[in-house]
């Protein structure tokens, strides 16, 4: 007698619809992971679109014949100073030696690229403290950011007050390019300072990030924290300000219709001067500084609410 034959079981079948959904879900998950990775990479590296620091300091004030002292301050948790810079005293008998200029350089290079500007300030006759932000020159290695630059500028003010014993009402903060935007923020936050000098502030410096083609693929406005809101800082300014603007003729340049009007909205007593680009300090540059410093006590009084 033959044993009963077992029924052949049918192999399981997979629904085509289910398979399509599984493949779609896998593709969506992969796309989401790729997009999140892109967001992370943009968040991590976008600072390089705005800041262009270099480490090697090629020049010092000695190259311009200036006496100076190397300085280091803002001690970190490891006990080492985070910031390096130069103290350049005014020449003996200089007209404005009672004033000290805290110089904030721009977003590119390092302190070694500012020797010509510092030499021009020395001709004006003021004391100068210039330093590199973290991530620049010989200062502590770090990615620059608006918050870091702001903290470093505050540390420089503390150094002037605590180590150099400089009175706040004799400190003028000068900034160039992005440094001018930083000087605006510092000036708005410290009404006890003598004033600010703004050399070609940037109307919207962070636009370089938002105009980059890669920013269209990610929520750049949520990923970028830096703003450098010049208009907001200008409105809050309550101390005297000198605005140095460049034009090829040295004459005022007509403002664009979309100009945010940083100067127009600035508070406090203000003075604006248009200068031709020059490799050496022009007489117009020196005259602008002299006029502004001569009138600074009166301007300070006029700026008080």
Predicted ranges, named:
Residues 165-177:
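Alpha/beta-hydrolase fold nucleophile elbow
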Residues 197-207, 226-229:
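Active-site nucleophile loop of the alpha/beta-hydrolase fold
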Residues 175-185:
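Glycine-rich nucleophile elbow surrounding the catalytic serine of serine-hydrolase chemistry
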Residues 31-75:
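An N-terminal hydrophobic leader/cap segment in hydrolases
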Residues 236-238, 243-247:
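Short beta-strand/loop motif that positions the catalytic acidic residue
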Residues 117, 230, 239, 252-264:
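Short alpha-helix in the alpha/beta-hydrolase fold that links the catalytic acid
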Residues 260-305:
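C-terminal catalytic histidine-bearing segment of alpha/beta-hydrolase fold enzymes
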Residues 78-161:
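Membrane-embedded segments
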